[in-house]
């Protein structure tokens, strides 16, 4: 039974990451988001698992993982926003912050688009989500801002060749290029 539930989570998280255009290394956020939303949605009897556990309906705004949202950044980040720039900044929705015991106090997790700019290109890039109380999201116009770059990297018909810097600092092309010698000596 538990293996089936784990598989259900995997089967829900994989397409969520793909749809959002976010790399698999952000699976921890996707798993938490999937489990939260799954528990907040009603089941056969019309009640949600959240309602059964907490005795009341979940008041969270249910937002797709990786969807475009607007939010006011944390006070430290808000100080660097230009004076006449909009206070709400575009970002990507990463989920819900839960306290120990699964209690939700109204905090959402989001990352600024500017902080995610290279997340699909650089596997070492760290992200620092903002824990915020208010998110602006339009369910009639769902957008996934990271999707385009994800598709460019993962679904190119002619992906760029693998390169490494040569002895002179210039890139060298590796692979089956014209003039490559067969490793067997022929």
Language-model segments: residues:
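Nucleic-acid-interacting cores, centered on viral/eukaryotic replication and modification enzymes
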Residues: 1-186
């Amino acid at each position: 039974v538990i293996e089936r539930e784990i598989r259900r989570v995997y089967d829900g998280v994989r397409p969520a990451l793909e749809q959002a255009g976010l790399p698999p290394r952000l699976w921890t956020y996707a798993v938490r988001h999937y489990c939260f939303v799954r528990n907040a949605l009603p089941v056969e009897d019309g009640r949600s698992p959240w309602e059964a556990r907490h005795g009341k309906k979940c008041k969270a705004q249910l937002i797709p993982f990786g969807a475009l949202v607007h939010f006011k950044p944390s006070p430290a980040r808000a100080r660097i926003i230009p004076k006449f720039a909009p206070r709400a900044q575009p970002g990507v929705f990463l989920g819900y912050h839960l306290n120990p015991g699964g209690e939700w106090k109204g905090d959402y997790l989001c990352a600024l688009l500017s902080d995610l700019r290279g997340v699909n290109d650089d596997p070492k890039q760290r992200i620092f989500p903002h824990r915020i109380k208010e998110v602006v999201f339009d369910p009639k116009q769902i957008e996934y801002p990271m999707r385009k770059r994800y598709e460019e990297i993962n679904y190119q018909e002619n992906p760029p060749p693998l390169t490494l810097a040569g002895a002179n600092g210039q890139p060298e092309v590796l692979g089956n290029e014209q003039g490559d010698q067969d490793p067997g000596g022929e």
